[in-house]
């Protein structure tokens, strides 16, 4: 019998970074909002410690820049430090150059906060699509070894339907580089692909 592996990942972003909340999408307004990052991350770290669970934290570069002590605490608690972009923008609405700039800014901000340069990435809203294959080359060039951006089913922010089964695989990029992909998994239910995990379910 093959043991099944369960991976816990957490996207570290604040309430005003939600993609579908248009009133707070301007970066210039973020610093004026009351942040919940410090208080809630502290509670989460205590809970994970009690349960003896380690997680991968996909962290916004903006969060790392503005709350470096939070990222230091996550790292000191033994969790993996990963990247969730810098400004939480949808990849398919960016150019390749702006995506590269956002990714590098995020990696720099995260490294400056805790001394660790991430090798894992997750796009905001799982927004790498069939129209943005260049994103994987950009990630590989930035030193990203594995990615968790693929949503292999239709969704409001795109989805990469042509990926196939929701299982890990090696993605070969346009420029013949490799990125190991850990996609979101799903079940087939009445002819439809249904993703059964994710923070969205906690918002119902």
What residues fall within each predicted segment?
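Short, hinge-like loop/turn segments at secondary-structure boundaries
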Residues: 26, 74-76, 99-102, 137-140, ...
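Structural motif corresponding to the early beta-alpha repeats
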Residues: 79, 83-96, 119
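Short, well-ordered coil/turn segments that N-cap beta-strands
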Residues: 2-6, 51-55, 76-81, 114-119, ...
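Acidic-and-aromatic substrate-binding clefts and catalytic sites of carbohydrate-active enzymes
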Residues: 33-38, 56-68, 89-100, 124-131, ...
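A cross-domain feature marking catalytic cores of carbohydrate-active enzymes
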Residues: 10-12, 57-61, 83-87, 122-125, ...
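Active-site beta->alpha N-cap acidic-glycine motif
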Residues: 2-77, 122
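Active-site-adjacent pocket scaffolds in enzyme catalytic domains
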Residues: 116-117, 123-204
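CE4/NodB-like, metal-dependent polysaccharide N-deacetylase domain
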Residues: 40-50, 54, 96-132, 138-146
